[in-house]
Amino acid sequence: MAPSAQPTAAMATFTRMVKGQMRCYSAPVDAAIPASKRKYIPTSGTYPKGFFVSGTHVGVKASNTKFPDLALITSETPCSAAAVFTTNKFQAAPVQVSKKILNATQGQGIRSVIINSGCANAVTGKGGLEDAMSMATKVDEYTGVAENGTLVMSTGVIGQRLPISKILSKIPEATSSLSSTHDAWLTTARAICTTDTFPKLLSQTFTLPSSPGRTYNIAGMTKGAGMIHPNMATLLGVIATDAPIVPSALQSLLKTSVARSFNAISVDGDTSTNDTVAILANGAAGGAPINSTQNDDYVVMQNILTSFLQSLSQLVVRDGEGATKFVTVRIQNSPDYPSAQLIASTIARSPLVKTALYGRDANWGRILCAIGYTQGVAPGTVVPERTSVSFKPADGSPVLKLLVNGEPEQVDEERASAILQDEDLEIIVDLGGGEKGELGGEEGVYWFCDFSHEYVTINGDYRT
C-alpha cells in the first residue's frame, strides 16, 4: 500500500497561486515551481474522515505579501496525539508549549495543530512562550475546546518575535475557512513552507487485520529544505489518520517510524531549534482501538506508518536547498543497526562527498574517508580488507563496483560520470566483504542530497 502516486504536473490553480517565489522567503523570484519538482505535487488525495484544514495569509514576514503562512489542521472530534521534537538545547517556544500540552493531557483530547511560517519564535524568551501559548488558546476558543486542545509549531528566522497581533487576528479566518477538500490540504501544506520550492503532501488508504473490510486513511504534510539533519532538523510534519489508536501506542508507533524516516535524512547536517513531527488519530473510521504493541493491528500499523513517513521525509531531501541529487546510502552486513546508521549518517553529511556528487565525480575515496572516521560504531565493524563500495544506477543497470574487499576496481570513468548525471543514485557500502556477508544481515539506510552553489546563495540571502 504505497502512498498516492505523484502526478507529473501541479494543478493549474495551485501553480498560479505559488507563482512568484522559487525559494520562498529566502530569495524571492518571479518563478513558478521548478518543472523538475512538479511531479511531486499530488492532484488528488484520500484524506482522513473528520479532519479539516486551512491555509491563511498573515504576512508573518514582511516580504510575503500574498502567500499563505498560517496553517490549521483540526478534527471535529477529540484525538489521540503524539509527537517527537528537536534535540537542540535551544528549543523554540512552540516546542516547549506543545510538550507542556502533551504532558498535561497525556496525548488525549487534542483537536488541532496551528503552524506559522516566516518566524521560528525561537530564542525569544518569556514573550515568545506567551505568544506560542496565545496561539494555542485562540484556536481552542474558536474550535470550542476549554483548554490544552491545540499543538503549536513555527518555522522561519531564529531570534525574532512573532507579529502575534497579526497572527491572532487571522485565526478566526483560519477557522471559518476550514475544509476537507484536496485543494485545502494542498494550500495548508503550502502555508508551512519557508525555503521549500514545493508543498509536500501525501495521502493513502489502508486496512487493518481486525477490520479487513474497513478502509482507513492517513495524510501527512511536511516542510523542510535546509537545516536538515536528525534528530530532527528545521523540519515540521503533521500526520492525521482516522484509525483508532490510543495515545501510548501512537507515541510508540511514531517514535519507531521517525527513527527510520525523518531521522534518517540529511540535507546539510544542521539540527534546528524547532523541529516537530506530530500525529493525530481521531478514530472516525471506527473499528477496535490499537491499544497494545503486541497485537496484529499494531504490527501492520507500524509498517504502514514507517513506509508512509519514509516517503514523506524523502520529499524533504528531494527539495534540499540547491540540491540536484537524491542519494540513498545503504550500509550492508553491519554487526548491528546503530553502527550501520552511524556510518550512513557520516557519509550523508560529509561536505566532500556531497560536493563530489554535485560535480559528478566518482571520488569513492571520500566515501571511504567518511566510513573510516565514523565515531561510535561497534569494534570490528569497519575492517578495510572486507569493505566494498558500489554505485547502483537508477535505471536498473548493473552496479558499478568501486572497491571490493578493500581492493580498488578499474573504474569505467565514462560510465561513472553517466550514472552521476541522473538525479537518483544509490551508494552501497558492504562491510562484510561483498557477497560473503561475513558479519550478518543488519542494514542501515540514509537519504541525502548534494551540495551546490545555490545552497550557499540561498543561505547567504536567507534574512534578506
From Swiss-Prot:
Q: Name a single GO biological process.
A: L-arginine biosynthetic process
Single GO term (MF): glutamate N-acetyltransferase activity
| Site residues (Cleavage), renumbered to this chain | A233, T234
One GO CC annotation, please? mitochondrial matrix
Which annotated residues bind substrate? T194, K223, T234, E321, N459, T464
Q: Where is the active site?
A: T234
Q: Where in or outside the cell is it found? A: Mitochondrion matrix
| Pathway(s) per entry | Amino-acid biosynthesis; L-arginine biosynthesis; L-ornithine and N-acetyl-L-glutamate from L-glutamate and N(2)-acetyl-L-ornithine (cyclic): step 1/1; Amino-acid biosynthesis; L-arginine biosynthesis; N(2)-acetyl-L-ornithine from L-glutamate: step 1/4
Q: What is its EC number?
A: 2.3.1.35, 2.3.1.1
Does the record bear Amino-acid biosynthesis in its keywords?
yes
Q: Which terms are listed as keywords in the entry?
A: Acyltransferase, Amino-acid biosynthesis, Arginine biosynthesis, Autocatalytic cleavage, Mitochondrion, Multifunctional enzyme, Transferase
UniProt record similarity statement = Belongs to the ArgJ family.
**Extra remark beyond the main annotation:** This protein may be expected to contain an N-terminal transit peptide but none has been predicted.
- This one is known as Arginine biosynthesis bifunctional protein ArgJ, mitochondrial
Q: Which organism is it from?
A: Emericella nidulans (strain FGSC A4 / ATCC 38163 / CBS 112.46 / NRRL 194 / M139)
